[in-house]
A protein has these predicted regions:
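AAA+/SF3 P-loop NTPase mechanochemical coupling elements
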Residues: 58, 95-96, 127-145
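Conserved AAA+ ATPase small/helical "lid" subdomain
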Residues: 186-238
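Short glycine-rich substrate-engagement loop in P-loop NTPases that contacts/grips substrate
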Residues: 73-99
Length: 241
């Protein structure tokens, strides 16, 4: 039935990065991981069908890789805890992304898992609705991240040919990442971006996203205003019992 719906079309390949405009300085704000940066760039530029799974605790480099990839043309971001099979299918038909950026894959529901299994292996996307069927042959690269792979179905885990496991940042790495990321994407002066990183590490939760949130709440680019935002976040921070 699936073959009849899709027809006998030849398998597509991901468009080379030259067509997608992969910048040479992508991942510039990520400290280290030069070998991984090179592998990802090669995959995209050469149009290779390869799926990457990034596993590690919150606020590690895996989050930054997804953020950087999400800026690329042709990328479609989704969150495992919020996506559904129907929503993912609609995204493939309506947007036909070349790159799927999937965070929290360890929380993805079963109906979305079924869609992923098919498109990651054969490129087949099939929808049956109101006794009508439509099919699509659509190959893409999947970059997914999660805190653990223990809750992932074995068949989904096996779809990823590149499984990478990340360790938490050190203090120096975290501050350096904040300096690079906030100055590049949030237009914060590098010295102030570094200060935000230090305060986030020492006063809050050591999460790059928290540092980004501080940068977006600034009313003026001063350390005093950073301190104001940090005090605000600390006031309403979760109390650990």
């Amino acid at each position: 039935v699936i073959k009849e719906a899709l027809g006998r079309r030849e398998e597509l390949t991901v468009a080379p990065a030259g067509g997608q405009g992969i910048p040479n300085n992508i991942f510039e704000c990520i400290i280290g991981y030069d070998d991984l940066k090179d592998e990802i760039k090669f995959t995209l530029r050469e149009g290779r069908k390869s799926h990457y799974l990034l596993i590690g605790p919150p606020a590690t480099a895996k989050s930054l890789f997804l953020m950087e990839l999400g800026h690329l043309r042709g990328a479609y971001p989704a969150t495992g805890s919020r996506v559904s099979g129907a929503g993912l299918t609609d995204a493939f038909f309506n947007h036909q992304p070349k790159i799927l950026i999937l965070d929290e894959i360890d929380k993805i529901p079963m109906d979305a898992t079924a869609v992923l299994l098919s498109v990651m292996e054969s490129g087949d996307v099939l929808e049956t609705k109101y006794k009508r069927q439509r099919g699509l042959k659509h190959d893409l690269v999947v970059f997914a991240a999660g805190n653990t792979d223990k809750t992932m179905p074995p068949e989904l885990l096996s779809r990823f040919d590149t499984k990478l496991y990340f360790s938490p940042y050190s203090f120096e790495e975290f501050v350096s990442v904040c300096r690079g990321y906030l100055s590049r994407y949030e237009n914060v002066p590098r010295v102030l971006a570094e200060y935000i990183g230090i305060e986030t590490w020492q006063q809050l939760d050591k999460d790059v996203r928290t540092a980004r949130g501080i940068a977006r709440r600034l009313r003026e680019n001063t350390t005093d205003d950073v301190n104001r935002v940090v005090r605000f976040l600390m006031k309403y921070a979760k109390v650990h019992e």
